[in-house]
Amino acid sequence: MNTLSEHYGLLLGPDRSWRVVDVDLSLEEKRVEIRLEHVPGTPVCCPECAGQRPLKDHAPQRQWRHLDTMQFETILTARVPRTECPDCGVKTIEVPWAEPHGRFTLMFEAFAVRLLQAASSIEKARVHLKLSWQSVQRIMDRAVERGLITRELEEVKHVGLDEKSFGKGQDYVSVMTDIDGSRVLEVAPGRDETAADVLWNIFSWEQKEGIEAVAMDMWQAYVNSVDSHVPDAEVVHDRFHIAKHLNEAVDQVRRAEHKSLMQEKDETLKGTRSLWLYNLENLSEQKRAEFELLKEAELKTSRAWAIREQFRWFWDCRSAEEAEVFFEEWYLWASGCGLKPVQKVAKMIHKRIENILSWFRHRISNAAAEGFNSIIQSLKSAARGFRNFANDRTRILFFCGKLKLLPESASH
């Protein structure tokens, strides 16, 4: 029959250079402590140059959190040998059960990563793991570091640039996505040209040459950054942002007209905001019937809505050439409508039309980036005060980056 030390030695599976020498079970603390020892006489190698070197001494005792044993917290302890390398100096050797400077075993980190990915919230995973927020953050930091090292960017052809409100007041982050891969590539604080420049640093010059198009809002800072880093890529102004601008114009007209009507005790537009902003197909039959009567009224809001609706057909054109003809006719109507919010958006689109017509060549948008919004907002609200940009970035890449997060030797 195996002794307890031999039993744990088989379960842990350390290489032959290490052995379990003692197992301490505390029923009161619900804790198992496993003491490992480097087998005397076993060769040691410098972790820097991998050369076999003489043993100098042993570092002070360290401990690592391991997978629980029958729901008992399990800790590995060891004094790790140090080598004396003529080239690299005195170095502590690597251990087979944990990464350098880690406080958790590879198996525990792999379990924690899988649990974080599967749990509905970081807090629930943290409670189950019986860890502090700081410890969970360190595990996520290390997982993202591993994932970024092995991430492949050679096949990225279509990139999205978008801004997200991610803090109090007017705090923003800039987010870069791989549109075809539906993943977040990088996050930078701010939404200016400097922030966008930081995002491009993840690519080599060879990888940048492979990027064909970039989807974004009509934000000049992002356009400038694209021109600097990927001058051969086409800018594609995102159709969903354009729709947002047109919606805002309709709403501005409605609010101004509603205020004017209410001064005359006319409540025609009261409570109608959603009717003007929703697509007809998303309205209930009752609401659609109400709206059919409303939009036939002699209202400025009706005209603004009609202009917005007409632009939706722009995206159904079969080519950029056909779309350009369509736009010129639409622009004559929109620019001459006498509704300042609509005219302002029409002029903005006219100014950027070349980067809008490019959609017909690439047909990309930031729809995937918009899909990450709910995840990013939930991460923001769940941080419980343990927030700074570095932590925010880690969490976004952890959950939205499609990275290989598991330790290599524990990923099976």
Regions found by a protein language model. Give the residues of each.
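Short, conserved DNA-binding cores of transcription-related domains
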Residues: 1-90
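Flexible, active-site-adjacent loop/turn segments at secondary-structure boundaries
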Residues: 10, 74, 93-95, 164, ...
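Tryptophan-centered motif/residue detector
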Residues: 18, 64-67, 96-100, 133, ...
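Conserved phosphate-handling catalytic cores of large alpha/beta enzymes
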Residues: 248-267
